[in-house]
C-alpha cells in the first residue's frame, strides 16, 4: 500500500501553523530525529539534533514561546515513496522572511526524521 506523504506533510503544516504540539507530534514516530541549524543557535549542546518526541516537544515549545506569531507559508512540495521535500517561507514579525527547505522521512505513515536547510 502506498502512503500519502503529501497528505502527511499538509497535516504537518496545519499543525505547525496552529502551534498544536499534540497534532504535530502525532505525526512522528516515538524515536524520530530532527535536525535544524536553529537548534545549533538556541541549544548549542544538541549540535543541531534532537531525538524522540519529548525532545521535539521541548524544541518546538521553546520556538513557539519565543516566536508566538511564527508561521510557515508553503511554496511547494515534492514527494516520493519515503520522503517529502518541502519549501516554505518562515514568517516572524520584525524579522526578515527566511526561505527554508525541509525533508521529512516517512515510513509506515509516520515521520521518522526531519532535516531543515536554510542560509
Summary of predicted features, one role per range:
Residues 1-119:
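C-terminal and inter-domain tail/linker signature
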Amino acid at each position: 500500500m502506498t502512503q500519502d506523504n503529501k497528505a502527511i506533510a499538509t497535516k504537518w503544516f496545519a499543525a505547525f501553523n496552529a502551534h498544536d504540539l499534540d497534532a504535530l507530534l502525532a505525526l512522528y514516530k516515538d524515536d524520530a530525529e530532527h535536525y535544524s541549524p536553529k537548534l545549533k543557535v538556541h541549544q548549542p549542546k544538541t549540535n543541531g539534533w534532537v531525538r524522540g518526541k519529548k525532545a521535539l516537544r521541548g524544541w518546538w515549545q521553546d520556538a513557539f514561546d519565543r516566536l508566538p506569531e511564527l508561521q510557515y507559508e508553503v511554496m511547494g512540495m515534492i514527494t516520493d515513496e519515503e520522503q517529502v521535500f518541502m519549501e516554505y517561507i518562515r514568517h516572524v514579525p520584525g524579522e526578515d522572511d527566511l526561505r527554508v527547505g525541509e525533508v521529512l522521512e516517512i515510513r509506515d505513515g509516520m515521520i521518522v526524521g526531519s532535516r531543515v536547510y536554510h542560509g
